[in-house]
Amino acid sequence: MVERLSEAARRAALDALPDWSELPDREAITRTLKFKDFGQAFGFMAQVALVAEKHDHHPEWRNVYNTVEVTLTTHDAGGVTARDVDLARAIDAIAAPLSPR
């Protein structure tokens, strides 16, 4: 089982992920991305889904038109783990060329 990050490790990880923030009411991190249109948002989600499936670690997300809200946590560990940080980095890499707002 993967270990939950300590508070110091979580803060350090978030410092390296400036577009992500902690959810105040949960042991999770979140990012909201806005794309130019629904097609671009859905394409982003499809790319993330392939990476998530490969790593067997899946985001919680919500899509409304051009906006995608992503939440990452490791339920088995009861909070944020290295798996969430790794997936957040992958999400940032997928999003970067799409220039989300």
UniProtKB/Swiss-Prot annotation:
Family of the protein in this entry: Belongs to the pterin-4-alpha-carbinolamine dehydratase family.
Listed name of the protein: Putative pterin-4-alpha-carbinolamine dehydratase
UniProt organism field: Rhodopseudomonas palustris (strain BisA53)
Keyword Ubl conjugation listed: no
Biological-process GO terms, alphabetical: tetrahydrobiopterin biosynthetic process
Record keywords, A-Z: Lyase
GO MF terms held by the record: 4-alpha-hydroxytetrahydrobiopterin dehydratase activity
Xref: SUPFAM superfamilies: PCD-like
Catalyzed chemical reaction(s): (4aS,6R)-4a-hydroxy-L-erythro-5,6,7,8-tetrahydrobiopterin = (6R)-L-erythro-6,7-dihydrobiopterin + H2O
Record keyword Lyase present: yes
Enzyme kind, highest EC tier: lyase
EC number: 4.2.1.96
CDD domains in alphabetical order: PCD_DCoH_subfamily_b
Pfam family, one: Pterin_4a
NCBIfam families reported for this sequence: PRK00823.1-2, PRK00823.1-3
